[in-house]
UniProtKB/Swiss-Prot annotation:
Segments forming domain bHLH: 235-290
PANTHER family: FI24210P1, UPSTREAM STIMULATORY FACTOR 2
One Pfam family matching this protein: HLH
Region of interest (Leucine-zipper), residue spans: 307-328
Protein name per Swiss-Prot or TrEMBL: Upstream stimulatory factor 2
Tissue specificity annotation: Ubiquitous.
Gene3D superfamilies with a match to the protein in the record: Helix-loop-helix DNA-binding domain (4.10.280.10)
Gene that this sequence comes from: USF2
UniProt keyword list: DNA-binding, Nucleus, Transcription, Transcription regulation
Binding partners and assembly: Interacts with MAF. Efficient DNA binding requires dimerization with another bHLH protein. Binds DNA as a homodimer or a heterodimer (USF1/USF2). In vivo, the USF1/USF2A heterodimer represents over 66% of the usf binding activity whereas the USF1 and USF2A homodimers represent less than 10%. The USF1/USF2B heterodimer accounted for almost 15% in some cell.
Gene Ontology MF terms: bHLH transcription factor binding; DNA-binding transcription activator activity, RNA polymerase II-specific; DNA-binding transcription factor activity; DNA-binding transcription factor activity, RNA polymerase II-specific; protein heterodimerization activity; protein homodimerization activity; RNA polymerase II cis-regulatory region sequence-specific DNA binding; sequence-specific DNA binding
Length: 346
């Protein structure tokens, strides 16, 4: 977009912009730069708003940018909200005295949010205005918030001094509808016509969204500081490390003994060196096998005890039979009887 060089006088800048618009025609994009300076409310009231007669064709295109610059780098920008009617845009009536100054304000230079707010009767073409609109009832239009204008497309004024405050205003149609805001006003002249461009921080305008509350911290945060250790803490730390080392050594020694006791693990350990997990796994298998063998041995032992008792009973019966046989032999000898078995045996 073509932009005129900034002048020290606001009226001269506006006149130059109007002259350029007549030279380029209604189809060319226009840019207007205004400069106002002031440090307090008194300077704001004394600053006059000079708006020259600009033809309606000059504002036919909505790609119009308004840029505010400070007279000194990093200073405050004093700006005002003005209302321009169709008659003033068409060149009808008084061009300077009929301008209605809504309010003035000042802010420090830096990145600010730009908010565009439409009011009822905003079918008019945008006029050169910027600042906060006083509260009162009016129908809202979509707004567009632009952070740090001219940051991603390059400033129209290439020779601008770095560090100065710059604020641009775009129509809502070129930026896109992002949200809506309610603007209240009590002045009937504000609802008569014209479109207002409001420049302020987003917190002052975007109050329709729900605010998320953050719970306060219940206890204070106390970061750990490693540099405040006492000799006692160092001694306790050393003792703890020594105890832990001894415990690990004992565990390793017992695992080595297990590897020596288990037959298969001892053979594997001598070759490749089994790990602790492998040693413990084979130890569990060996213990399980020993338990099964012990159970079988218990059953066998019970059977042996039962057989032993049976043998004892049989032995007793044999002794009784031997005694009975000896008595019978003695009786036969008393009666001089020979046993048939013995005679034939002889």
């Amino acid at each position: 977009m073509d932009m005129l060089d900034p002048g020290l006088d606001p009226a001269a800048s506006a006149t130059a912009a109007a002259a350029a618009s007549h030279d380029k025609g209604p189809e060319a994009e226009e840019g207007v730069e205004l400069q106002e300076g002031g440090d307090g409310p008194g300077a704001e009231e004394q600053t006059a708003v000079a708006i020259t007669s600009v033809q309606q064709a000059a504002f036919g295109d909505h790609n119009i940018q308004y840029q505010f610059r400070t007279e000194t780098n990093g200073g405050q920008v004093t700006y005002r909200v003005v209302q321009v009617t169709d008659g003033q845009l068409d060149g009808q009536g008084d061009t300077a005295g009929a301008v209605s100054v809504v309010s003035t304000a000042a802010f420090a230079g830096g990145q600010q949010a730009v908010t565009q707010v439409g009011v009822d009767g905003a079918a008019q073409r945008p006029g050169p205005a910027a600042a906060s609109v006083p509260p009162g009832p009016a129908a809202p239009f979509p707004l567009a918030v632009i952070q740090n204008p001219f940051s991603n497309g390059g400033s129209p004024a290439a020779e601008a001094v770095s560090g100065e405050a710059r604020f641009a205003y775009f129509p809502a149609s070129s930026v896109g509808d992002t949200t809506a805001v309610s603007v209240q006003t009590t002045d009937q002249s504000l609802q008569a016509g014209g479109q207002f461009y409001v420049m302020m921080t987003p917190q002052d305008v975007l109050q329709t969204g729900t605010q998320r509350t953050i719970a306060p911290r219940t206890h204070p945060y106390s970061p750990k500081i490693d540099g405040t250790r006492t000799p006692r803490d160092e001694r306790r730390r050393a003792q703890h490390n020594e105890v832990e080392r001894r415990r690990r050594d004992k565990i390793n020694n017992w695992i080595v003994q297990l590897s020596k006791i288990i037959p298969d693990c001892n053979a594997d350990n001598s070759k490749t060196g089994a790990s602790k997990g492998g040693i413990l796994s084979k130890a569990c298998d060996y213990i399980r096998e020993l338990r099964q063998t012990n159970q079988r041995m218990q059953e066998t032992f019970k059977e042996a005890e039962r057989l032993q008792m049976d043998n004892e009973l049989l032995r007793q019966q044999i002794e009784e039979l031997k005694n009975e046989n000896a008595l019978l032999r003695a009786q036969l000898q008393q009666h001089n009887l020979e046993m048939v078995g013995e005679g034939t045996r002889q």
